[in-house]
Regions:
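Glycine-rich phosphate-binding loop used to anchor ATP phosphates in small-molecule kinases
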Residues: 127-149
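PAPS-dependent sulfotransferase catalytic domain
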Residues: 145-276, 294-295
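PAPS-dependent sulfotransferase catalytic core
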Residues: 1-130, 134, 174, 178-182, 189-207, 278-323, ...
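C-terminal alpha-helix
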Residues: 268, 323-326
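Residue-level preference for the first positions of well-ordered beta-strands
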Residues: 58-60, 138-141, 246-247
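Soluble or luminal CAZymes and related metallo-dependent hydrolases
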Residues: 116-124, 140-143, 215, 219-230, ...
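Short, flexible helix/strand-to-coil boundary loops that buttress conserved ligand/catalytic motifs
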Residues: 86, 169-173, 308, 328
């Protein structure tokens, strides 16, 4: 089989040449072990009786899916005092736990029991975060693309990442074409079935046929609705929290002035920005080459201009136009 032939990887088909280039890029620099340090360090080995939370502080990275939370996490990991890993999805555990507390007569009638139960749940989550992250870091983080509320990690500082909803839509659509089992309804939408077959055969199908990517009106409208709803919920949650707990970060600002934005990130956690490592190939804005069938595909701003037809734009703005305007995006 030659490199130009198409092979099957269990999700969709990809060009071997693209995959080989991706692997070469990932090997370019050992600096990737800095940005991804939770993966490259041994687990903390606690001594008997040791409190592994002692001296640790906590933060979370939140934002709608495909808003760049992975990149933000890697930027934070360039600082020796910070370690961020994902995705814990604590809300999926804490939500049912809190509901159980609320619905139990025992927890509500026995004075102080509900509070003590929640304190122990919070400690369990934080201990898991410490074990998953770099043992020498002071600031321990969880990167999960989710809403700010409920803020299940008590007293954690919050990075709220926001990205142009149109670029989110493009990235999200590519993501579901690459991983259709993540959202089965997507692959079952009649407009997407043919496109999925085409994409499996040629990973550059949408680059060659850009008007096809956002051709499913139902998915465009659903995505616009969910994105706008997430922004609204996060805005409300932010207003209910002290200013020092939340830092709003725009994806586009990271691209345009990454030096100043990195300074903001580190200063929010009260660490010295000058101690952070230099940017490397996997933390600089964007990628050297677009690889349509990779999780980290392009990392660009304004990519929606390549794919959004007038019909898709109308469908998107119908559900998210007001939110785009409130955030200051030109429409």
């Amino acid at each position: 089989m030659t490199e130009s032939e198409i092979v099957e990887d269990g999700r969709c088909r990809f060009d071997n040449e693209d995959l080989a280039q991706h692997r070469r890029t990932m090997r370019k620099s050992s600096d990737q072990t800095v940005a991804d340090k939770p993966f490259h360090t041994p687990m903390l080995q606690a001594e008997p009786g040791q409190d592994i939370l002692e001296g640790k502080k906590f933060f979370v990275v939140r934002g709608f899916m495909k808003s760049g939370t992975n990149w933000l996490c890697r930027l934070l990991n360039l600082h020796p005092d910070i370690s961020c890993a994902g995705e814990f999805h604590w809300q999926n555990i804490a939500g049912p736990f809190v509901s159980n507390l609320d619905n139990s007569n025992l927890f509500n009638q026995k004075t102080g029991l509900r509070h003590e139960m929640w304190m122990r749940m919070d400690r369990m989550m934080k201990e898991c975060m410490v074990l998953a992250n770099h043992p020498d870091a002071t600031w321990i983080g969880d990167r999960t693309p989710a809403h700010i509320a409920p803020s299940v990690v008590m007293d954690a500082r919050i990075f709220n990442l926001i990205r142009d909803g149109r670029d989110v839509l493009v990235s999200r659509t590519y993501h579901f074409f690459n991983y259709p089992t993540v959202f089965p309804k997507f692959a079952e939408m009649p407009e997407n079935k043919r496109r999925l077959r085409e994409f499996k055969l040629d990973s550059h199908f949408f680059i060659k046929n850009p008007d096809e990517l956002l051709g499913c009106t139902e998915f465009v409208e659903e995505s616009a609705h969910y994105w706008a709803e997430a922004i609204e919920l996060d805005d409300k949650a932010t207003k209910d929290l002290p200013d020092e707990r939340v830092l709003r970060v725009f994806y586009e600002d990271l691209h345009r002035d990454i030096a100043q934005q990195r300074k903001r990130l580190y200063e929010f956690l009260e660490v010295d920005p000058d101690q952070a490592a230099e940017l490397s190939f996997n933390t600089e804005p964007g990628f050297e080459k677009e690889i349509p069938n990779r999780f980290l595909r392009k990392g660009a701003i304004g990519d929606w201009k390549n794919y959004m037809t007038p019909a898709a734009m109308d469908s998107f703005l119908k559900h998210a136009g007001d939110t785009m305007e409130q955030l200051g995006y030109e429409t």
